[in-house]
Amino acid sequence: MARLAVVTVLVLSLEWTRALVERSTGPIPTIAIGGLALSLVAIGWRPEALGLSRTHLLPKLLGGLAIAAVLLLPAAVRWQGAPLLPPPLAISAIAISVGEELAFRGALFAALEAAFGPLAAVLGSSLIFAFGHVLSHPPLFLLAVLAAGLVLGTWRWAARDLVGPIVGHTLADLAL
């Protein structure tokens, strides 16, 4: 229980600090550093506990593509041929996506599951993920963040895998 509290406070503190610093320094360095900092939350966890194993890598990658497709459906409806992200912003988007997944669906999910079971892990990590974005997104967008968290968390639980959510989240962030 103590580990869960520490992970939750650490994840939210890092996410909110990144959002606040971004307002004064600009998005590219802040997002990249924030993503790397969030990745540090996973230190000390066994890869298997985080859903990171090398077995069945192809299905996990394909699952990530499917997750990305689901997350991008609303954006695809309104897409108007927007250009690709410039490389510095793309690198930052990758860093924050990987960092958020390691933190929210990796360490936080594992701590919630150990303390309260899989349903609490899916719901709790999704709610905390949405709450972590309150400083960086408008209120209505938080519902989309919550929905994305539920999709990513459900995959994490059902497949016992974090590769799919990392791939899906990264592709969605690169496309949005």
Short names for language-model regions:
Residues 1-43:
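Alpha-helical transmembrane segments in multi-pass membrane proteins
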Residues 4-5, 60-65, 90, 119-124, ...:
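Hydrophobic alpha-helical transmembrane segments
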Residues 8-19, 68-77, 126-134, 170-176:
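Aromatic-anchored segments of alpha-helical transmembrane domains
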Residues 14-17, 39-48, 73-77, 155-157:
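Structural signal for the C-terminal ends of transmembrane alpha-helices
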Residues 25-30, 59, 80-91, 138-143, ...:
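Juxtamembrane helix-entry segments on the extracytoplasmic side of multipass membrane proteins
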Residues 36-39, 95, 107, 150-160:
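Generic transmembrane alpha-helix motif of multi-pass integral membrane proteins
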Residues 76-134:
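Function-critical hydrophobic alpha-helical transmembrane segments in multi-pass membrane proteins
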Residues 141-176:
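Functionally important transmembrane alpha-helices
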